[in-house]
Amino acid sequence: AMSSMKVAQAEYGMGMGYGISRLHGALCSGTIDGKDANGTAYFQKVCVQAPSPPWFWGMLHLDDGSYIDWFLPHVSPTITAKDSRPWKNRDITHLPLSMGGLFHDVSRNRSEKFSEVRVERTCDEGGLPTFHVHMWNGITEIRIEARAVTRAHWTFDQPTRGGMKSHLTYNEYPLDVTRLEIDDEKGVRNRSDWGVIRGNAEHSWGLLH
């Protein structure tokens, strides 16, 4: 399931919509600092023909082959942001436009979707966020705390009407998972039930149109 390509697309009308092709966990091998390495990697190709509001997205790869994915496009005061400076005073709340989560659970031999997803953030002294993720679907409830270890970001300034520009800052954060709790009909699992967990999160602000 991890190395099978999944395709999703949606059309909103008036020629606007998106398409995405994803490999949730492609098996990879290579060298790092001259040493052989094996693992999994997430790949995606996204085509968007629509205004891009802010979003939260994250992906965790667990060492047994399981993965957890969440996505939360939203409206917030940061939609008016015009630069890449993090943790603006207006970054205080957000209103989800949609919510989606996925847990491919190897030990339970199933994949579960989640339509209830909450994402909150706290910030350390260096300006890096910790993401607090809560997902549930009536069968399984997942709680995650994942600390960003660094930040990479890209900015887009696109000319629009009247000589003005629309702006989008897109952030990537490699994650250190400090808490993981999965509660389902068979019991509770936590961070100690897995060894290595690797992940990445995205957070954006502004509105590209």
Regions found by a protein language model. Give the residues of each.
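Structured soluble/peripheral alpha/beta segments that form catalytic or ligand/cofactor-binding pockets
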Residues: 1-209
